[in-house]
Every structure is written in C-alpha cells, then in structure tokens.
C-alpha cells in the first residue's frame, strides 16, 4: 500500500503556509541570530585555545617542579 503524499512529509512540512510564515523569524532577527552565533563560536574557539595553552603551561610547570 502506498503512503499518501502528506504522510511521507514531516509534521513540520505538512502545516499550512500561513502557519509556516508565522513561525519563521523575521529576516532581521534571523540575521542578528546568525551574527550572535558566529560571535559566540569565535569566543568559544578563543576560550578553547586559551585552555589548551593553560594545560600546556601546567604540564611545563609540573616538569620544572620535578627537576
């Protein structure tokens, strides 16, 4: 038995066009979210790099203590 066209689609896709437009953020909000996301990702990369350096320094410190 074949599935109807609507049954194959996800529940999100099967809602009306009007509801889809209401649930979508406005282009300005979407752009702001993208900028914020990129900014947060950059900060996360910086934090990870700093933590890596701290770990390296801690290992060096431990080596010098052992001498």
Swiss-Prot record:
Superkingdom to which the source organism belongs: Viruses
Extra facts: The P gene has two overlapping open reading frames. One encodes the P protein and the other the C'/C proteins.
Role: Seems to stimulates transcription by the viral polymerase. May play a role in viral pathogenesis or transmission by insects vectors.
Protein family membership: Belongs to the rhabdoviruses C protein family.
Protein name: Protein C'
Species assigned in the record: Vesicular stomatitis Indiana virus (strain 85CLB South America) (VSIV)
